[in-house]
Amino acid sequence: MTITKAKIAAMLSSKLGFSNHLCEEIVHTVFSNILEIAKAQKLTLKNFGSFEVKQKNPRPGINFHTKALVIIESKKHLRFVPSSKLKALINESTR
């Protein structure tokens, strides 16, 4: 299921009774702050999970067309580790 920030804002608006515009600003601000924190360090959302930017080291690879050995450059990737409570919730809902 894909959910947009606008949909989250609409859900907040209907649940809390605030204007849709205010809820959109709140959601945008929250996500912007989460992104800024996640870029700099590990971000843990209690009872949800942890986001961390990890660095992959350069490694050898093979070009499948030419069979030549190439070096794959280092790059950053995002790692998410769900909390034990989130895992338990997911496992309960599948039973």
Swiss-Prot record:
GO CC annotations on file: cytosol
Alphabetical UniProt keywords: DNA-binding
InterPro entries, per database record: Hist_DNA-bd, IHF-like_DNA-bd_dom_sf
GO molecular function: DNA binding; structural constituent of chromatin
Entry's family note: Belongs to the bacterial histone-like protein family.
Protein name, as recorded: Histone-like DNA-binding protein
